[in-house]
């Protein structure tokens, strides 16, 4: 009853806040919403920008925007009353989206009615091209779908569109405008990279190997899942040998920057990691936005994270280190692509990873990346944020 009363109250409250209200990953200042927010301020500085962030992220929000704690009543009211809302995790999960019985249809209709508000527009960018299966496609979750009424999905390629339309059962309209967080990765200059390195506190005269594993979960954020989400891979590596291999193949001195999923970052002790690896690993979670680290990375190493697809736009080498590939693909999650169809070499052992680094071929890699982008129907061109900004300006000036 309380939930229904809350829905009614939200439905009846007027959409009086003539502003763009942003949130990312339910409380972070990052990702595509951040890119859109920056472009909106650049092109239309007169439009009020509000960010809903967790308390520890408030200082990350620039002074031209108003930061509100997402876990407060003020945050809830701003989200409810805003004329335009932008996020990257719509994620209203439902187990009934694929059911056709009358009761399920009625319940979904009621939910849609109360979450649809006249005069309010919501854009969701999602957060990457998927390799790992989601929603109804995921192993063991064939009845699960996602839906968020009154929301337009903004996507960067036809493949992701097909996946999202399937797992939302066609309940959300899609616009193919590109992935705003990727704009930063186009037309980078050496000066851009050095400026960003300085902002992140990365060594200016060393090359950066970014290790960014995905989060593995059986439905729980426990210590075992945290361990399996990058810590285990680190223990299988000899970091000194790894950096030597990159130095031999790509010249210069290299450093390893580890960027863990935020669920993992919240659980691990970076001081312990620094001691265990004699200070040879740099904390890549010190700043909230993954895109900044991708800008600085001279090479990327991951497993099933969508950052591999974003990173292709830099033209720099990417390697997959995936010791638990078979279990992840066949038992735990499932993947949309055969791993051998990707442009990246995939290694299940550390020795094989070293071989892949030594045998890397630039021209072959570039050709494979271009073919893959054509295959998935890529529309990213570095101007996605501008397109979304134009839509927001139009919505707020109606």
Regions found by a protein language model. Give the residues of each.
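Active-site and donor-binding regions of nucleotide-sugar-utilizing enzymes
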Residues: 19-187
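Conserved catalytic-core segment of nucleotide-activated headgroup transferases in glycan assembly
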Residues: 31-36, 181-272, 347, 384-386
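C-terminal amphipathic helix plus adjacent low-complexity
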Residues: 1, 6, 224, 350-398
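Short acidic-hydrophobic, aromatic-tinged amphipathic segments that line or gate anion-handling sites
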Residues: 66-71, 281-286, 342-356
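Nucleotide-activated donor-dependent transferases that construct or modify glycoconjugates
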Residues: 2-26
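Donor nucleotide-activated moiety binding/catalytic core segment of transferases
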Residues: 68-84, 262-306
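A donor-sugar binding/catalytic signature common to diverse glycosyltransferases
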Residues: 87-107, 112-124, 287-331
